[in-house]
Amino acid sequence: MESRPGSFQYVPVQLQGGAPWGFTLKGGLEHCEPLTVSKIEDGGKAALSQKMRTGDELVNINGTPLYGSRQEALILIKGSFRILKLIVRRRNTPVSRPHSWHVAKLLEGCPDVATTMHFPSEAFSLSWHSGCNTSDVSVQWCPLSRHCSTEKSSSIGSMESLEQPGQPTYEGHLLPIDQNMYPSQRDSAYSSFSASSNASDCALSLKPEEPPSTDCVMPGPGPIKVTDDQANVSENSGSSHSTSEDHVTSTSHASSYSDEGHHSGPAKMARGPPEPPVRSDSLPASRAQLLNGEQHRASEPVDSLPQKEKPGLETVLPPRSSNQFCCLSGQDQVTDEDHQNCELSKPSESSQDDCEHLLIEDSSKALDSPKAHDKGSNKEFGLLKEASADLANTLNFGAIPHLRGTMEHRHSAPEQLLASHLQQVHLDSRGSKGMELPIGQDGHQWTVSPLHNNPKGKKSPSLPTGGTQDQTRKERKTTPLDDKLMASVHQSQSDVLLGEVDGHPNRAGRASSDLTSQQPSATCSSVQQTRDFLSAHKIVDHTEASEEGDNEPKECGRLGGRRSGGPRGRSIQNRRRSERFATNLRNEIQRRKAQLQKSKGPLSQLCDTNEAVEETQEPPESPPLSASNASLLPSYKNVPSPGDKVFNKSMILRARSSECLSQASESSKARGGVEGRMSPGQRSGQSSLALNTWWKASDSSTLDTEKANAHHGVCRGHWRWSPEHNAQPQVALSTEAPSNPDDSKELKTSTPQAGEEAVLMPFADRRKFFEESSKSLSTSHLPGLTTHNNKPFIQRQKPIDQNFQSVSYRDLRCHPLDQSYHSADQSYHAADQSYHSLSPLQSETPTYPECFATKGRDNSLCCKPVHHGDCDYHRTCSHPCSAQGTVRHDPCICCSGEICPALLKRNLLPKCHNCRCHHHQCIRCTGCCHGPQHSAHEDSSMAPGNAWKSRKAAIQEFPVDKWKPITGNRKTSHSGREMAHSKAGFSLSTPFRPCIENPALDLSNYRAVSSLDILGDFKRASNKPEESSVYEDENSVASMPRPLRSRAFSESHISLEPQNTQAWGKHQRESFSKGSETQPDTLGARKKVFPPPRPPPPNWEKYRLFRAAQLQQQQQQQQQQQQQQRCEEEEEKEQEEEGEKEEDLPPQYFSSELTGSCAPNTEEQPQSLKMGHQEASRQGSQSLQEQEAFALHPSNFVPPVRGCTVPQPEKAQHPCYYGTHGLWRTTEQEATVTPKQEFQHFSPPKGASGIPTSYSAYYNISVAKAELLNKLKQQPEMAEAGLGEEGVDYELAQKKIQLIESISRKLSVLREAQRGLLDDINANAALGEEVEANLKAVCKSNEFEKYHLFIGDLDKVVNLLLSLSGRLARVENALNSIDSESNQEKLVLIEKKQQLTNQLADAKELKEHVDGREKLVFGMVSRYLPQDQLQDYQHFVKMKSALIIEQRELEEKIKLGEEQLKCLKESLHLGPSNF
């Protein structure tokens, strides 16, 4: 064991006796701290071992290496039964680092301070070192954290690139940025919800007390005075600069400060999960103080550097301007997922080989990391690889000794950034849009570099479909640009690296990587330009965000500024400077805005309030300039060369990325790429999005959408006022304008000037204006109008405008549920991708994907044209594919412009699935709009290039998981959701169902969505082939009322429907018997014309497991059932009739059931699900798999248990909801027709899942169910008379078959749970035998006999209690269901009940007595047994009774299921001949 000072000592610790172990852990990967022992309890096992000390870092538990996760450690510790074997790592002796007065001071009087003080121990054992050079004392100070070991880091998504070939990564030597591993790992693991977590790693955190991550801030050596309340920015920045080489850090730090001073605005906005707070006594804090002390002197000469050299440094560093790594400025926590993958850890400059290898590797990872990106874009990736290789050669980090010496880090994020930005720039130049990777040659879409593509880390950004056509053009331009690009990169690289030799290597690496993507320095070496550009970045952020009514960027800018400068003075200075610049720039931008707005109509003016004008057409070479960029352009006017264009492009790109307008850039690029070739008017469509953003209340998209939209051509087309005050886009036709600094001028010139001046109206006025205009438009169906509302969407008067940029703003304002269901963001993008790769025909019109892509963030605004006759108006369907939740309805075109009253009554969120985005085509007043609109939709959806198949107007087309609370595996269900969403939303090939002709009838479609509707959506998605015919069938049946179709179900509705509804259902079945034969499911729940008042929706979450369990067999069953149904038509009709008659049975028969199982049905049903899964809950993996199956195969989900009133109808209804009405109707009908019996007989015991001893409810239910089934068998005889009239009702048979199958599956689950329980029982018995043997060896024989008797009595008493409670429950149930006339039988039952009650009371006394004996026996046993064996004894006793109860409960459930199964099978086989 190496014992050099400062080296780590690995100490094995073995604790015995079982929990509690007597020590406390703190830190962990979750907190970005090492997992250390914070406390050892006196007298505890850890203290008794005398090997563990506070401050020890856990590295191994029971032979399992730890990788920093506290949760993992806790699981391993809890999993230790009696022996806990640990390996802890502690510093042998503290080492004061060279230049670390802080540590030296700590160590002065305390040689063993490392082991005695929590504070130093944390600092010393912290997995991430403070960035010292690995060559000097770094071995002691850079222990390789277990979390950072190479093989582990390779599992961190794109962090695989951490494994550098030449990088020594051995235990005890931590590479310079281990800290980054923590955020990186976290980001990779949590990318699903922390979209900007990487931004938080790369940008300054928002709170002063929350130091930025190591990578994001390169501490500046300037006079860094760290105040207590504000850790120096460098605290966390495990910058790879070596404190021993002061000169190395000086320049770069100053530059980093100056840089970040300007970028405090952007940096501030990194709004991902905030960095974990850094303890004041942690290594980052001490490191900051060290930097204060030591680097203060080093940086003194450089103090004025920000003022003197700032321009030069910024020229070198501008790329770092947080644009690449911080998607900021109000972007709502949406740094792209790849930001996370490109965690800004120090570049590994160990060698050129490393750099090249990592560069290529990282570029590949960066490309591959987007979760939803098209994997087929290998050609793009190949180009990127080449570019990466070239760049690697260019950026030979290894060639610069300082860079190599100061930091060796396996986390090649800068290379990732290089690769991704190279990809950005390369592909930008190639895509000539400068903002987004063109769609791959194979037609797949690539968004901006992975750094800028996935908002929320999930949406796979996709270009508009038009991108495919543009690809070739972009490709043509690729070569010259790439050459120039590489040349400029090389030049800028050399500039950066030379400038940074004495500077912060990390900075240099970043700068180089950034420059590669930006390529500004090469062509625009002027310091001022870069400086302006940097400032502009921040200003862009400030301006865009602030002008959209969000002052957050400002505050964040201040915070960022405060944090970005190490010393408070410099921070304030930088902040003031940047704020002044921001103010000036903002003023200039506003002036430009005012000028542009004066020349535009009020509508465009409204659109422009979000942002200054963007160029109407952008040449392929340059991305659309944001307003702020436009204001910056004058500084670049003197840069005419193509390289300069590239510079501008990259600058703008970065500016956009700094605002995290990855989406915005995507959309603008998409617009640039696609719209450049599309009619400019289409671009104008995007501006409408800007309008919509105002109403977009959902937090996650407010700023994002505003900015994204603002960036999309707010000015892409001008709007003029038509006599009806409907702003219509005046399409500017100059599509290819040269990309030069004069773009902003082109903006003005290219956009037609509207004659009317408009004054910037306040938000309320704009909103009012939009609402009014939308109303007026909705009421006036002028054939010439292409825009529905003032939406500046490119609405060309095409009979079929696939560019459905719609305009209703209603949804944008309130997405009450959006926030609950944002998680499904990738769904939309999944859907997007499938459409981007559609045929080039769609490139003409910005299709829905473009709507998303161009809108970056505004996925919630899926716009689709609703064609009402000639009026090709576009409406934004706000719950678009994003499945963001309920949204407001479009104003009804047929009503007074307001939402249809019917919809309002039901609080319906009309959702149309027709055009790519669900439009509300059918949602107009169902009576007024039909025919033409439908046909237009059909035409549009069936257009040759239009791969989006029309879809029946149905309620929210959410994946089920979005609506239903998800208890299960969200990730696994995501794929299912995406699949279902893309399928359900867009791939249906069936003709769109004609608009509702009968308003009264189809209003049910638009009731508030219930889970069944959602589930049905899933079902529909996968059962498209079957349902296509159903859709057509629906057209004929459209007039049929569908009573509960879309309503949330309550048990009462299902079980207690009036008989007249049954008669109505029969009538309907007869009317459509032919259709039902071919598609039995089409005939179902049209029994009620007007649904009963809407009950509170049941909690579907409880039914997920049960439904999931029944998934796989459902499809097969359905097919079989359809065949069987035809064969059993008559039988089932009879049974149905019998069911109806049964409803007439005396209420006493059902009284117990109705009161016990029907009313609390909601509660019971969950339990019915639990019957199958309650015990299986222990088999978590199984249930999760079932859930996955459910998510992946929602279509297979058929209501298995009609008995589960709520879930069952839901299940049955789903298919019908989407067209196979029969199934759902059948469910409802059956639920009502085969009255409560069936549904009750299957409703699970109320108390079954509850306290095991409360069996009365359980037995009550089970007996009732059995009786109901028995009676159900007899019902056919009673109902025989009325059966002849009715046709065969095979629906009931189908339901019974489903019930049989579901019960069978449930039984299999229960039996599996029983087997697992038996294993537990056996294990506990073995433990009991061991305890018994130990006791026998140590205690007296009479005492041992007491123990033995106690254990036996405990078993007997528990079984007795269970048996008596069960019998008593059965008797009570019999009493409840007995006929009032059977007095004799009733008396017998009452007497028996009294007897059982007395016996149960005696048994309870016995149990109390046994409990008393247990205490005595425990006192006796505790005298003989050591602590660990005593714990074994306690565990054995406690588990013995619990396992007995659980076993009995499982047995009862299995017995009940078998009874139900038997009864169902018998009733199913009873035919008319048997009566």
Curated annotation (Swiss-Prot):
It holds the Pfam family PDZ. It comes from the Eukaryota. InterPro entries: ASD2_dom, PDZ, PDZ_sf, Shroom_fam. Residues 1090-1099 have a biased composition (Pro residues). GO terms for biological process: actin filament organization; brain development; cognition; regulation of postsynaptic membrane neurotransmitter receptor levels. Interacts directly with F-actin. This is Protein Shroom4. It comes from Mus musculus (Mouse).
